[in-house]
Amino acid sequence: MNIDEASKIILKPYITEKTFAMVENEQKICFIVANDAPKPKIALAVKTLYNENVLDVNTARTIYGKKAFVKFESTDKSRDLATKIGML
């Protein structure tokens, strides 16, 4: 997957108090993703854009669009990525 395709899947990070706490407690970061994106493509897009290994992806459809909760290997990796994308 190239960066253009990955950018069409991962639209933006979703930042709230709850998702901020998820970075610290559950090693998860929440993204707004394309409505037709399946979980394996979301994981591959995160790997392509941010060079981080993904353990798990959970999705939910909301009024804001489709949210993907992406779990990383350790708290350090999730914190580093959150800092890189401007969440922290």
Features from the language model and the residues they span:
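Contiguous, often N-terminal, cationic amphipathic patches that form binding interfaces
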Residues: 1-88
